[in-house]
Amino acid sequence: MKIYHFGAEDAPVLLLLPGTCCHWKSNFGAVIPLLADSFRVLCVSYDGFDETEQTEFPTMLEETEKIEAYLKTHCGGHIRAAYGCSLGGSFVGLLAARQNIHMDYGILGSSDLDQASPLTASLQTDFLLPLIYPVVRDGKFKAKFLQKRLDKCAKESGDYVKAFLKMFGDARPYVTMQSCKNQFYSDLITPLPDKIHVPGTEIHIFYALKMGAKYRARYQQHFAHPVLHEQNLQHEELLACHPEQWAHLVKSIAL
C-alpha cells in the first residue's frame, strides 16, 4: 500500500480512499488540485492496485490496519477528514467504528455498504469477477456483446458512464485477479457495526437518490447520526461529473 500526498504539510489532513478496483489517480486526479490549496491531501493506493508495487490486496481489516498505522505515524493518529468513494466508504466506516485513529469528519460517497454471508459473498464474487476483471486488466469487457452494450449505454446516458469509466481507470495488467477477488469478497463479509457513534466525529454521506430509497435506511442503520446530503444523481456522479461542486461540498463540511 502506498500513500500519495499533496498540499502544505501543516494544512488539515484529508484522506482520500478509492472505490472498488479503482486507480487512485483516475479516481481522484481531477479533484486533488481543487483540494490541495486547503488540505494536506493523502490519497491511498491499495495493496494490489499500485503499479509501483508487486502486492496483492489482502482483506479489508488488514488494509484498515495499515491505514491506521500510517496515520498514527505520520499524522499523530488524528486527521481532519476522510472521504471514501464507494468501497472507500466502507473503510471510512471501519476507521470510525474501530476508533484506533480519530477523524473529525467521515464522508461516504454514495457507498452501498452491501454485506453478505460468506457463501453468498463467494457466489456473488465468482459471478462478477469474470465480467469485471477483464475491464481492470485490459480496459474493456472480454465479451464483445457486453462491450457493445456498454458503448451503447455510454452514448445514451451522456457524460455519466464515460466519466465513471474514466474514474475507474485504464487498462492495468499489473492488477491480479486475486486482488480483485479479495477486495470484492472481503468487503462483502466484513461486518460494519450498527449505530456507529464516535464523540467528536461527524459522519456525512453523499446520498445519490437515484441509487434507491433503501440506502437511506441502510445509512441510518449503520450510523447513529449521519448527515445526509441528498443529490438527485447516480452512484458517485457528483465526483465523476461535477468535480468542482464535489470539492466545494467537501470543503464546506471539513473547513
Where are the language model's segments positioned?
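Conserved HGGG/HGGXW glycine-rich cap/lid loop of the alpha/beta-hydrolase fold
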Residues: Y4-E53
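Active-site loop/oxyanion-hole signature of alpha/beta-hydrolase fold enzymes
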Residues: L42-A81
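Gly/Ala-rich beta-loop-alpha elbow adjacent to hydrolase catalytic centers
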Residues: G84-V92
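Hydrolases whose catalytic domains are alpha/beta-hydrolase-1, hotdog thioesterase
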Residues: F91-L95, Y215
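Flexible "cap/lid" loop of the alpha/beta hydrolase fold
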Residues: A97, Y105-V136
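Conserved alpha/beta-hydrolase catalytic His-Asp/Glu region
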Residues: S117-P118, D138-I196
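Conserved serine/cysteine hydrolase catalytic core
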Residues: Q178-Q221
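Catalytic histidine-centered segment of alpha/beta-hydrolase-like enzymes
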Residues: L233-Q245
